Amino acid sequence: MRLKTLAGVKTMCIDEERFEQAKNRIIGVSRERQGIGTLSEKTTHAVLKNYYAPDPAVHEIPVADFVADICDGKEIIEIQTRSFQAMRRKLAAFLPEYPVTIVYPIPRQKWLYWIDEETGETSAGRKSPKKGNPYQAFIELYKIRQFLGDPNLHFRFALLDMEEYRLLNGWSRDRKKGSERFDRIPTAFVEEVCIDCREDYMQFVPYEIPENFTAKEFAKCAKIPVRLAQTTLLLLTEQKIVERIGKEGRSYLYRVCEILS
């Protein structure tokens, strides 16, 4: 997926060969024969860690009172597959000392598999109708909004195709609702969206947005839910990418700020 924006999408070239090597190192080429039960519970985290830093000597390095996923003495890379709220204390310790890049995987296309804990059987895969996009990261960015202005903080949103394995242990009759996620297996690295400075947030403003717009109009142009658009606009306002200029009925009215180079 490409974000069509005013400033253009800032992406990095995906090294497909290195990604396959990272997958094979963690998953193993014979995982289909061995079965899902042999896999690590944090496969996506491990694959991305090996993609961004193939040298294991820089993995799991003590820094301050914490352990960094990757640290080569010059910078830190953190692979964050869950809530960014857990990153607050780490960021407070890391950012004064090192540039920190947070890698956040987003499922672009997902295939769902169900595991019966009693029999060990795994269902056939079903393609999820939902597709992920980079705007989803703003839900997590909101949780560390106090750090977003730090020039040492960078982001890589990794859009991945993946298989998701869930345990049939939920509360509903079919045991799917409220079920536990067992593992996510990345199958393809589709795109990487980068944020390295304040101006990079401009790429999240849709190209076709009107000069003055509401959150509902932003949501329509970005093809995201209104609630997600509201969160995105809150952070874009704080980063001085957009500004509130009044109201239209009960809705806030926004416009894009002029970005000075």
Predicted regions and their residues:
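A basic- and aromatic-enriched beta-loop-alpha substructure that forms the phosphate/nucleotide-
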Residues: 89-151
